[in-house]
């Protein structure tokens, strides 16, 4: 299988890539299939079942809302986040769903959308969509899995244990960090150069660069919105947004940087908090590689652009390419789904990606980049996913800030060494996968363990 940088970084909507972006894409794919097979006009009823982690925390993650929007033909990268609430209210009050925006059917959420805690066999985030005609006969049924980071596979792909259906031949194919580093050594390339060459299999280099700078712009817009917007986050926990107030404090007292050598970390915290508060509010974010961990790479990239002399757009492109190469290793050899391996697969992976990427743009050798990425994951091993109330708020928002700072520190440690290290990136990825498999399901995005049951919702 072949994965692109744009498979790892996708423009979407909050609060969750696996529970919001994935279900929306699956729902849209299902109704597009109805139209493709000529079944849309005959459809009078659609029933949806969300299983496992989707069933357990789907309400808090907005999975139900995502499904409704997807059935109406919306996609995460283009849906107007400003009109979502009004559209959902209209669907629910009128009891009508406009499939693909062109075929209206009756829809009662209590009857037609079920959330079931029991998982389907292949993955904790399973979904079944069924369409019926006027006689009540089932005319189409599909089973989908949201496998993390907005990736969706259908039942056929799941049966073949495939992540994507892309078999595009690449100039430098790699399955492991060992393979990746071998390409770098043989051809004298950096990791970002290997990735950029591979991207040419899909599009010209100029398009790849432009696409990555667009991703960066969305990240900047998200941070700006998070620094501007205030209030209480939705969902019932009454979590107060903090980024805007922190931004005012930092701008009001810039001379503090002269007194406090660690004041730069306040800015890193700000960037991460801003992104994840926007995500929790259902705003426009970039999966990096997931929504739950969407603040780390933007925060570290903002750190690079604001505080590192000589930073520029070329560095942004190299940063994102390197981060994607590392993310692909986790995607193919472990998981980026909190429902499958806990938060080590989300915040842990994002921390590892950001660390390796920052190390490259700061001039680190390929070996130092691998070391930084390994450190970023090694010290996130065992991290649980236990969101209070099933919401991507506590501990998720602060955890992104902690992961961002940890990534920067991993780079500093790696750059002070010669690239030689005891634990390889491949071994830590394998360890993460095994740790996730051993982790009890109550710690994997079900809101049935950890903080989720020890903190009373207010």
Segments the model singles out, each with a brief description of its role:
Residues 9-27, 281-300, 341-352:
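Conserved phosphate/anionic-ligand binding catalytic regions in large, soluble enzymes, centered on
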Residues 311, 322, 328-401, 413-422:
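Hydrophobic alpha-helical bundle architecture
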């Amino acid at each position: 299988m072949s994965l692109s940088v744009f498979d790892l970084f996708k423009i979407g909507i909050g609060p969750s890539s696996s529970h919001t972006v994935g279900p929306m894409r699956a729902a849209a794919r299902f109704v597009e299939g109805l139209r493709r097979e000529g079944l849309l006009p005959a459809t009078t009823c659609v029933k949806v079942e969300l299983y496992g982690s989707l069933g357990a925390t789907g309400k808090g993650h907005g999975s139900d809302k995502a499904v409704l929007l997807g059935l109406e033909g919306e996609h995460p990268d283009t849906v107007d986040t400003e009109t979502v609430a009004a559209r959902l209210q209209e669907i629910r009050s009128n009891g009508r769903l406009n499939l693909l925006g062109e075929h209206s059917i009756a829809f009662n959420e209590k009857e037609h959308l079920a959330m079931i805690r029991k998982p389907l066999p292949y993955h904790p985030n399973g979904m079944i969509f069924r369409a019926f005609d006027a006689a009540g006969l089932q005319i189409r049924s599909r089973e989908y899995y949201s496998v993390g980071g907005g990736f969706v596979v259908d039942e056929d792909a799941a049966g073949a244990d495939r992540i994507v259906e892309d078999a595009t031949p690449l100039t430098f194919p790699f399955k492991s960090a060992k393979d990746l580093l071998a390409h770098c050594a043989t051809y004298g390339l950096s990791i970002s150069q290997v990735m950029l060459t591979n991207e040419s299999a899909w599009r010209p280099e100029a398009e790849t660069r432009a696409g990555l700078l667009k991703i960066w712009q969305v990240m900047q817009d998200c941070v700006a919105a998070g620094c501007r917007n205030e209030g209480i986050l939705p969902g019932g926990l009454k979590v107060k947004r903090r980024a805007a107030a922190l931004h005012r404090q930092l701008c009001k007292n810039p001379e503090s940087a002269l007194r406090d050598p660690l004041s730069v970390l306040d800015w890193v915290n700000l960037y991460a908090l801003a992104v994840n508060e926007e995500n929790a509010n259902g705003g426009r974010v970039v999966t990096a590689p997931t929504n739950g961990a969407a603040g780390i790479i933007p925060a570290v990239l903002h750190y690079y652009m604001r505080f590192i002399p000589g930073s520029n757009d070329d560095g942004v492109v190299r940063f994102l390419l390197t981060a994607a190469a590392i993310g692909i290793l986790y995607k193919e050899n472990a998981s980026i789904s909190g429902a499958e391996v806990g938060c080590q697969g989300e915040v842990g992976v994002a921390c590892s990606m950001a660390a390796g990427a920052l190390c490259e743009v700061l001039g680190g050798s390929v070996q130092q980049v691998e070391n930084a990425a390994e450190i970023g994951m090694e010290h996130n091993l065992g991290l649980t996913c236990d969101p209070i109330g099933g919401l991507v708020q506590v501990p998720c928002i602060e955890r992104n800030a902690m992961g961002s700072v940890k990534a920067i520190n991993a780079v500093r440690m790696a750059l002070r060494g010669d690239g030689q290290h005891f634990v390889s990136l491949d071994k830590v990825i394998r360890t993460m996968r095994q740790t996730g498999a051993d982790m009890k399901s109550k710690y994997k995005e079900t809101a049935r363990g950890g903080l989720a049951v020890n903190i009373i919702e207010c």
